[in-house]
């Protein structure tokens, strides 16, 4: 479900760092 995806994404972002988050946000806004 969506909650599971959020948990996975959250853990992944913590490992990969804020750089990935910025890239994702940039991609989402285009």
From Swiss-Prot:
It comes from the Eukaryota. Pfam families: Ponericin. GO terms for cellular component: extracellular region. Expressed by the venom gland. Coiled coil: none annotated. GO terms for biological process: defense response to bacterium; defense response to fungus; killing of cells of another organism. Keywords: Antibiotic, Antimicrobial, Fungicide, Secreted. It is found in: Secreted. Belongs to the ponericin-G family. Has activity against some Gram-positive bacteria and S.cerevisiae. Has a non-hemolytic activity. This is U1-poneritoxin-Ng3e.
